[in-house]
Regions:
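Short gly/ser-rich loop at a beta-strand->alpha-helix junction or flexible surface loop bordering the NTP-binding
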Residues: 1-181, 200, 217, 306-348
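Surface segments flanking catalytic/ligand-binding clefts of nucleic-acid enzymes
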Residues: 6-9, 22, 159-348
Length: 348
């Protein structure tokens, strides 16, 4: 349809506004059937196609829902996370979550989930003109209500963006001790780490801890003997000289520089891995599909640790043998079993 035939040009079109502009329900219905409008929910439409991104669609659904609320409420939980720009994993976004203070009732519909809970004034902020729980309250709500892995993903992202801090989270956690979900929240907060740089890294860490394969550190810098930075890895098991890398398409996209394509980044990553191996570190990699099979990821990392440990043992043996060959006298000075160096045989 032409510009003259279109309803008012806004990303979100409300039925009441269209009717006020002279449009009828029949006309709106025809536009929906023709695919020129998409119905978000009853009485709310968007022009042309819906965004492919789930978070972008949910932002539109939030706006469409909030304008129809008859009583004050703050957008909360995963809906608040979307407004704050926190990435989510495996969290349903088919309904808008809001929180009202006590004496309200728990409204639930196909597109709305209303929580009734105490809500301090300083726990509410505004995003794009919409009342929303602040990042800390949002994080606590998610930590109380989501499964552990999904909660850690959101908390990691907030900590990495410095929208959250462990000290503030732990302080606010004291306010909800004994409340439903408070133990789950405490566990998720204890597991969260802002050094994770992606959903995949967060999920990997949770899985590795669950399978008793925790890395000794994150974002480990491998340096040459002269102290030159060779590369930084997502995970490290320093005792075995093993680093771990989660490979995701989003990660490679984030590394792109102007004029580069993904192939250039993959080649640069291969060169970086070769340089890390040249410093006598082993490398283990995994991809998104393996996060859906935690047993396979755990088996891959366990085998890599065993190989790296065996390599370390052989290297130490070779180094010891080389040292003895260069200094045969040291072999004669090596204490025999049951004999203390510089003293009489040990008593039995």
């Amino acid at each position: 349809m032409t510009d003259e035939q279109r309803p008012p040009a806004t990303p979100l079109l409300l039925r009441r506004d269209a009717l006020a502009s002279g449009w009828s329900d029949d006309e709106l219905g025809r536009l929906v059937r023709a695919g020129e409008l998409n119905r978000l929910r009853r009485g709310a439409y968007v022009d042309s196609v819906l965004p492919a991104d789930a978070a972008a669609r949910h932002r539109l659904l939030i706006r469409a829902t909030v304008v129809g609320l008859r009583r004050p409420a703050a957008v909360s939980h995963q809906s608040a996370a979307v407004l704050h720009g926190l990435p989510l994993w495996d969290v349903p976004l088919d309904r808008v979550h809001v929180t009202r203070r006590p004496r309200a009732w728990n409204d639930t519909s196909r597109v709305l989930r209303c929580h009734v809970a105490r809500l301090r004034d300083d726990e509410v902020t505004e995003v794009d003109g919409i009342a929303v729980t602040d990042p800390v309250r949002t994080a606590l709500d998610l930590a109380r209500s989501l499964p552990h892995e999904a909660a850690v993903v959101a908390l990691d992202a907030g900590l990495h963006a410095r929208a959250l801090s462990h000290d503030v989270l732990r302080g606010r956690l004291l306010d909800i001790v004994g409340a439903p979900g408070s133990r789950s929240a405490a566990r998720a907060i204890a597991a969260a780490d802002g050094r994770s740089e992606s959903v995949g890294e967060s999920r990997s860490r949770v899985i590795l801890h669950r399978w008793k394969l925790p890395p000794s550190t994150l974002q480990y810098e491998v340096r040459s003997a002269g102290g030159v930075l060779v590369g930084r890895s997502d995970f490290a098991w320093e005792e075995e000289r093993l680093v771990g890398e989660f490979d995701g398409r989003i990660k490679y996209g984030r590394l792109l520089r102007p004029g580069q394509d993904v192939g250039d980044v993959v080649f640069a990553e291969k060169r970086r891995e070769d340089a890390i191996r040249d410093e006598d570190w082993d490398v283990v990699r995994w991809v998104w599909a393996e996060l859906h099979r935690p047993d396979r990821l755990a088996a891959r990392v366990r085998r890599a640790r065993e190989r790296a440990s065996a390599t370390m043992t052989r290297s130490r043996g070779v180094a010891l043998a080389a040292g003895l060959l260069q200094n045969p006298e040291s072999a004669n000075n090596t204490p025999r079993a049951g004999v203390r160096a510089g003293g009489p045989p040990a008593s039995r």
